[in-house]
Amino acid sequence: MAVEIEVETPLQDDVQGLIAELNKALLELTPPEFCFHMTAEQMAAADTTVFIARDGGAAVACGALRRHEDGVGEVKRMYTRPSHRGRRIGAAIVDRIETLARQQGMTRLVLETGDRHPAAWTVYERAGFTRCGPVLDYPDSAWSVFYEKTLTA
């Protein structure tokens, strides 16, 4: 069965479980003060669109687009369960995020990820993101790696 990616509410029990796994995974690699989590409730806000990948109905991956001022979109909450890694599900979610950002007139995507997440770097770099300095209101930290991508028409 093919993995399907759709916009969904993060307030569903199984999606909240996926978010809890994401938070746990981040805290295993990064000090809490440098983990910039969003709760499921924050992810359900009007400024954020959440994409959920499902395999046979089970939530297996997520990612979100958070809208900021001046045409900037932020890639947030990217996670794929270990059982589904290596299948380019994360890349497909990033593609969906970028497509939505373009449709909504955004001109730039940015993101913050951890310094111990080389698999994530690969996903972003393959999607055309380049490393940059700190973005939005994130602190400049050795624990963070920042990326950006200019969106052209």
Annotate each predicted stretch with a short phrase.
Residues 2-3, 10-11, 107-110, 114-128, ...:
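C-terminal "cap" of GNAT-fold acetyltransferases
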Residues 81-83, 87, 115:
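Active-site acidic-Proline motif in GNAT/NAT acetyltransferases
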Residues 34-35, 88, 119:
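Alpha-helix N-cap and coil->helix boundary residues
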Residues 2-76, 81-83, 94-96, 100, ...:
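Acetyl-CoA-dependent GNAT
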Residues 87, 103-107:
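Short coil/turn segments at alpha/beta junctions that flank glycine-rich nucleotide-binding fingerprints
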